[in-house]
Amino acid sequence: MSIYMSRAELEEISEGLITAYANKFSNRVIQSIDIEHFITEFLMLRIEYASFAEDDAGRIGFLADGATPLLVHQDGKIIPFVFPKDTIVLDKFLLAEKEQGRRRFTMAHEASHHILSKMYAMPSEGRFHAEYDSERSYSKEELAQMFASVEWQADTMGASLLMPRRIIENALAKYNQSNPIRVYGDNTITSKDKAVIRRMAAYIGVSYTALVIRLRDICLLYTSPSP
């Protein structure tokens, strides 16, 4: 059985889920996706916060399977704790206001693991969302896990759930008269367009970097040869 879906397939599934969510909760899909509400009221998953004590500080989110323990700080000790199945556990530091973008994306990533396990009719298993740290040395096994197909799929679906095309197009209309953002060469964006992206990101509730990646993925970055 294949355990791979293309970007187009992931986009289509995400669009279908968001459409079903919007039909059920018509006041929830306006300028951004209330990902916490989507998770708890539509997917019917729980969200909890804990102080992670894993060796890998990049592990900031976890989808519990009811069997795999998560190392957490509790009462001055580090203990293995098993959370109930279908619980998304986030590191407590993500509650800070400045971490809103990372918090929302981590929720979407873990929710995507749940959705994908249902699509593949596979039993759910405990999965971490780990952020890549360019200053850290990773083992081959850690790198393989981080960039595994299932993680790419969860990242791709998470971005699609959090930033549906319709939401981005609405923000682009509001802040850039529906014009695509121009990129010169491979990565150069003017200060003016960077400011537009920052306003769009704040409006949607995501990070600048996540939005740039999403704009590129859905072909709303226009490549120009020179300024």
Predicted regions and their residues:
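Active-site hotspot residues in diverse enzymes, especially metal/ion-binding acidic/histidine motifs
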Residues: M1-S224
